[in-house]
């Protein structure tokens, strides 16, 4: 049974400060995502149309997905891929003093912290030698995910770092070179099917290991703002090697063949795959044309494809911030993390369940799926915090799932003061908790207030109740609008759902 998580009512705090800080935090997230997407080749995304294959029509009503980031970064419980790339500070500051540029190059201080980057690409890739998970049990993960109400799973088969979680015949940095060729994907696929979950593969066409002799490992925004700095090699030293045009062309052809070959393996070795989640495109002349969506659908006719490789796909993706305030007309997904990180990072606190459920219900009110990110440890385990938070979400879903599963945004003739969904003759209003200063953790929760909810453009309700326990709520109705009283005494730290029957 869902623990009440009841608040103690308190006086109102300044809403303006909260809103201002929330906007500032979202603005910072947007800037980071924009810079990273530019570096990996994610451009404008469209989903004007989507596949009509009957096997793909599960997607818009799926609601809740689990995004699992796993790779060699788990060896040191650090963020994935991006820590090897210095120069974010240089993306914000133009260095015009030649002496200061020389100092930065000499000391490797590309993040302007008075010290070199904590890890070089070569040091990062060395973690592959120590990546050999002995407690990998995806069935345990996904049994808990299913009980929590998740409908589909997406696992990183290969991130930008370049390490593939299966023994690939293409490229030279995967489990065939390490772990005696152990395949980490097949147990995951089997566990998805066993637990009735849709199978999703994340795949990054950018492969920094494959590109290590050619790539500038300076953060793209930093290199763009400060073009006087040299390109950096895999030791984060000024790159000294050069390549002929023929060598570059041969590398680019091999790169395209590697990406095409690995995607083909993912779509032919593991049976039916429900979703393919790309993240960028190869830095080659052919780029997104290394494999077409038509070729992908010949291998997997019912697959759902995101637009981050080809620029168009079956659904648009919003990352870190929900990029719309209006109901979407096509398919869409919002992905964010349960902690501050995509993979497992030691001692990273989990965002409050009320925050996560607030983002989930806001997404569903707009017709958007919510893809929530977690990561296993180096041994292949979920930490207790994941299971504990899944249990809270699962209990909430048992009582309130009808408000988010199979529901749609409100009809265009209706509006509400809070996020809301519609299903037949019922409407569901979501009263989410508030957080101070744009925060998202338990310590940021603000005390509950009495709240007035409004729903306009409807006929006279036949019943209004708190969905979790069926208790009646006071309301008034006039001129097609209902005003509902939700007292602080009935609020919880989670999202409180009000059911309006018409």
Q: What does each of the following model-derived ranges do?
A:
Residues 4, 14-15, 393:
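Intrinsically disordered, low-complexity Ser/Thr- and Pro-rich stretches
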Residues 1-11:
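Bacterial N-terminal signal peptides that target proteins for export
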Residues 25-502:
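Mature catalytic domains of secreted/periplasmic carbohydrate-active enzymes
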Residues 9-21:
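Bacterial N-terminal signal peptides
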């Amino acid at each position: 049974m869902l623990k009440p998580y009841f608040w103690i009512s308190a006086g109102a705090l300044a809403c303006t400060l909260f809103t201002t800080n929330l906007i500032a935090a979202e603005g910072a997230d947007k800037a980071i995502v924009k810079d990273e997407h530019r570096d990996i080749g994610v451009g404008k995304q469209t989903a004007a149309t989507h596949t009509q294959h009957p096997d793909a029509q599960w997607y818009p009503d799926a609601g809740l997905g689990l995004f699992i980031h796993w790779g060699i970064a788990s060896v040191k419980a650090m963020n994935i891929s991006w820590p090897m790339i210095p120069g974010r500070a240089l993306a914000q500051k133009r260095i015009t003093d030649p002496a200061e540029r020389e100092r930065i190059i000499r000391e490797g201080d590309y993040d302007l912290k008075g010290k070199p980057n904590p890890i070089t690409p070569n040091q990062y890739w060395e973690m592959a030698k120590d990546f050999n998970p002995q407690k990998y049990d995806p069935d345990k993960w996904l049994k808990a995910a299913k009980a929590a109400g998740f409908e589909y799973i997406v696992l990183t088969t290969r991130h930008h770092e370049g390490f593939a979680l299966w023994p690939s015949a293409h490229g030279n940095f995967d489990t065939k070179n390490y772990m005696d060729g152990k395949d980490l994907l097949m147990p995951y696929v089997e566990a998805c099917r066993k637990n009735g979950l849709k199978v999703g593969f994340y795949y990054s066409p950018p492969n920094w290991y494959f590109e290590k002799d050619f790539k500038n490992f300076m953060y793209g925004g930093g290199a763009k703002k400060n073009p006087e700095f040299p390109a950096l090699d895999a030791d984060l030293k000024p790159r000294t090697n050069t390549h002929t045009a023929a060598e570059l062309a041969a590398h680019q052809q091999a790169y395209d063949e590697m990406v095409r070959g690995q995607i083909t393996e993912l779509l032919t070795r593991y049976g039916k795959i429900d979703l393919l989640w790309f993240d960028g495109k190869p830095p080659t002349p052919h780029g997104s044309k290394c494999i077409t969506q038509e070729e992908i659908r010949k291998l997997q006719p019912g697959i759902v494809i995101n637009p981050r490789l080809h620029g168009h796909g079956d659904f648009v993706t919003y990352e870190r911030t929900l990029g719309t305030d209006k109901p979407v007309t096509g398919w869409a997904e919002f992905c964010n993390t349960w902690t501050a990180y995509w993979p497992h990072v030691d001692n990273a606190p989990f965002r409050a369940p009320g925050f996560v459920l607030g983002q989930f219900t806001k997404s569903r009110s707009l017709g958007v799926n919510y893809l929530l990110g977690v990561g296993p440890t180096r041994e292949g385990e979920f930490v207790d915090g994941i299971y504990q938070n899944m249990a809270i979400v699962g209990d909430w879903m048992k009582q309130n799932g009808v408000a988010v599963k199979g529901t749609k945004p409100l009809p265009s003739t209706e509006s509400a003061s809070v996020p809301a969904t519609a299903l037949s003759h019922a409407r569901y209003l979501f009263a989410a908790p508030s957080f101070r200063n744009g925060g998202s953790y338990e310590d940021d929760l603000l005390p509950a207030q009495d709240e007035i909810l409004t729903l306009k453009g409807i006929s006279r309700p036949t019943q209004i109740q708190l969905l979790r326990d069926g208790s009646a709520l006071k309301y008034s109705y006039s001129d097609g609008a209902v005003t509902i009283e939700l007292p602080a005494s009935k609020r919880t730290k989670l999202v409180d759902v009000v059911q309006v029957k018409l």
